Structures are given as structure tokens and as C-alpha cells.
A protein has these predicted regions:
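Conserved, mostly hydrophobic/aromatic
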Residues: 3, 41, 98, 111, ...
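Hydrophobic faces of well-ordered beta-strands that scaffold small-molecule active sites
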Residues: 44, 128-130, 163-167, 192-196, ...
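Shared catalytic-loop signature of beta/alpha-barrel
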Residues: 56, 210, 216, 225-242, ...
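C-terminal extensions of enzymes
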Residues: 330-375
Length: 375
């Protein structure tokens, strides 16, 4: 079986509500979608972060896949090992799009689910985290935000069955602390997290962390910039620290462990360059006694299915993962169903999802008119 063609599409899909963080507010997601075709008729689908800049890299890398077997992924990764050096996150994202498409094709060719190809299931359902941002209380005065967001979060967790909640933090450290206190008061039993995306200084991270110790947070994610800063915070705060910003490649792992900077590392198939690297990260975390979770970059159904397969086959990934999937107003696959705050791991061949090509074309046309929504 040889790859004969690679199709690349860039799509814009709306969110149900605006989503805000310490560095952006967005109303939709732009994603790059890939299809590989083979001489046997088997096809594989992939999806990755961002839009046209990543799609341009994907098209360059795709030239190296033509004539190769989808099973020859190790050779493909070795050939592209310098791509992240030149393109950073964009390079990892581009490699991952093709990587996932090849895994999907391998599963379809063998009649096996991606979970089975990765070692078999260790869980059949994956719990998601309810993501809370200040945009969930539009027009509310700052003084009233804690109460408004607590009411919103209580409603979301009750209706959706979520057992974990993450607040997207901002540069308003005191305001974030006040919101978290109110969230804990109405949700005493959920796993509670906060992620300022490194918007806080080291001193502010220490002060906020000490103030938050009484709330029994599951972890504090990327309060400040860098491994050195995180290590200073961890030395003074009795809350586990998590990162998806200072350990973003394997070269970062050793210094983070040596300096005692983190307790939990967020992996991501699309930020780490594919499925095998994400599984390798899990092995690193288990070896050094660290926790692991999965980051969300706005995955649609194809990318979500890949994350579910990784979680479904990886014992260390036992926490409720971050996922924006339930926040999208539509999808380009037959939708995955959220039940009791969880998604079931697909069991069909490959990714186990079916792409709606009419919707794919529609949302590609939206991108052609509007340009990229997320960069």
C-alpha cells in the first residue's frame, strides 16, 4: 500500500460562545484537515492546529509521503526531524496532521481501531474538563464576576456531568483568586484547576498560590514563564504545578525534572508532533513519577478522536482531559456524544469517525472568505 495523494483543507468553525484567556478572545476555530489517499483505496484523515501557515508546511511535507507506505512513519519522522527547529510549534502541528492521517489509514487497512494499534484499551470512556472563562459572564461588572461565573459553572457541571473544572486565568491575579474561591464554595467536590497561560509574575504566582492552597486545587497550570520561574514557585507553594508551556519538547524534560519545576505535564498530539511522541512523553512521565494530562487547542472531531485513542490506551492519562470539543457549534464528522461529562473512545477501524465531506467543503469555503480565525 502506497500513498498516492494528500489533500489539505483549512476550515473555520464557530464556537457556541466566545472563549477568552489571558492573551486572546476567540469566537471560532481555524483547523487544518488532511486526507491521504492510497493505491488500495484506503484513506486516512488527520487534523491539526491553526490554519494557512500550517497548511503550507503540510503541503511541503506531503511531498515526502507520496510513494511511501502509511506504515513507514518512523522513516517519515526521522526525515522531518529538523522541521520543528525551523518552524517551531507550526512544524510540530504540520507533522502531526500527516502522522494522524497515516495512523487512521493503518487502522482501516488492518481493520483495527487506533486504540488497539496503540496497545489496546485501558479505559472505554474519557472524562472532559469543564472550561470556564470570563467570557461566560458577558457584561458583568468585575465585582460581580465571581458570583456570576460560579452560577454559570454550577449550571454547566450539573447539566453536563463534569467532575473537573478549569478556569482560564487572566492578568487580574486577585480577580482570578476571588473567582476560584467562589467556584470552590459552590463546587466543593470537583477537581479544580486554573491556567493563566504564564500571565502572572513569579512573585504574584507565589502569593496567589499560597492564597489558593486552602482550596485544594488539583493543580496550578503555567502561572508564570519558564522552567526557572516555575521551579521558584513550586519551591514555595503547596499546590502541584502543571505545564504545557515550559515543557514543550523532549529537550525541556531533563531540566524541568532536575530543577523540580513541574508535577504534571500536558501533552498534545498536535503540539508534540504526533501520536508516537505523545506516547513517548507518557513513558517519560511514568519513569520520573510525574502526572500527565492532555492539552486542548480547539480540536474538532478528527483530532478529538486521536486524543481519545491516546488516552484510551495510556494508563498514566487518568485525569479529566482538557477538550474544547463540546464548545463547538458544529463539526465536520458525525458528532461524538458527551454523556455524563465523558466521551467514549471510538472503536471503529482507525480513528473510528466518519467525515462529513459536505460540511468539510462548506467550512473550507468559510475560511476562503474570512481568512484564519486563530493564528
Amino acid at each position: 500500500m502506497k500513498i498516492t495523494d494528500v489533500d489539505v483543507h483549512v476550515v473555520n468553525l464557530p464556537l457556541l460562545n466566545p472563549f477568552t484567556s489571558s492573551f486572546e478572545t476567540k469566537t471560532g476555530e481555524t483547523r487544518t484537515v488532511v486526507r491521504i489517499r492510497t493505491d488500495t483505496g484506503v484513506e486516512g484523515w488527520g487534523e491539526t492546529m491553526w490554519g494557512r501557515p500550517v497548511a503550507a508546511i503540510v503541503k511541503i511535507l506531503a511531498e515526502d509521503l507520496i510513494g511511501m507506505s502509511p506504515f513507514a512513519l518512523e522513516a517519515f519522522h526521522r526525515k522531518q526531524h529538523m522541521v520543528p527547529f525551523f518552524y517551531g510549534y507550526l512544524g510540530y502541528a504540520a507533522i502531526a496532521a500527516l502522522d494522524v492521517a497515516c495512523w487512521d489509514a493503518m487502522g482501516k487497512a488492518t481493520g483495527q481501531s487506533l486504540t488497539d494499534l496503540l496497545g489496546g484499551p485501558v479505559r472505554e470512556e474519557v472524562p472532559l474538563t469543564a472550561l470556564v472563562t470570563r467570557a461566560d459572564a458577558p457584561g458583568v461588572r468585575p465585582a460581580d464576576l465571581p458570583t456570576a461565573l460560579a452560577e454559570h459553572t454550577l449550571r454547566v457541571t450539573t447539566e453536563g456531568g463534569f467532575q473537573a473544572v478549569k478556569l482560564k486565568g487572566t492578568k487580574d491575579v486577585r480577580g482570578d483568586v476571588a473567582i476560584l474561591r467562589e467556584l470552590r464554595s459552590v463546587l466543593p467536590d470537583v477537581s479544580l484547576r486554573v491556567d493563566p497561560n504564564a500571565a502572572w509574575s513569579v512573585p504574584d504566582s507565589v502569593r496567589a498560590g499560597i492564597a489558593l492552597e486552602e482550596l485544594d486545587l488539583e493543580y496550578l497550570e503555567d502561572p508564570c514563564v519558564g522552567i526557572e520561574g516555575m521551579s521558584q514557585v513550586r519551591a514555595k507553594v503547596r499546590i502541584p504545578l502543571c505545564t504545557n508551556m515550559c515543557v514543550v519538547r523532549f529537550e525541556d524534560f531533563a531540566p524541568a525534572v532536575r530543577l523540580g519545576a513541574v508535577d504534571v505535564i500536558h501533552g498534545d498530539v498536535y503540539k508534540w508532533g504526533g501520536i508516537a511522541p505523545t506516547k513517548a512523553l507518557a513513558a517519560h512521565c511514568e519513569t520520573f513519577g510525574l502526572g500527565m494530562n492532555l492539552h486542548s487547542g480547539g480540536e474538532l472531531g478528527i483530532a478529538t478522536a486521536a486524543h481519545l485513542a491516546v488516552v484510551g490506551s495510556t494508563p498514566v492519562l487518568s485525569r479529566a482531559i482538557d477538550s474544547m470539543y463540546y464548545l463547538h457549534a458544529d463539526d465536520i464528522i458525525e458528532p461524538l456524544t458527551l454523556e455524563n461529562g465523558s466521551l467514549r473512545v471510538p472503536t471503529g477501524p482507525g480513528l473510528g469517525v466518519t467525515v462529513d465531506e459536505d460540511k468539510l467543503r462548506h467550512y473550507a469555503e468559510v475560511n476562503a472568505r474570512e481568512g484564519d480565525l486563530t493564528r
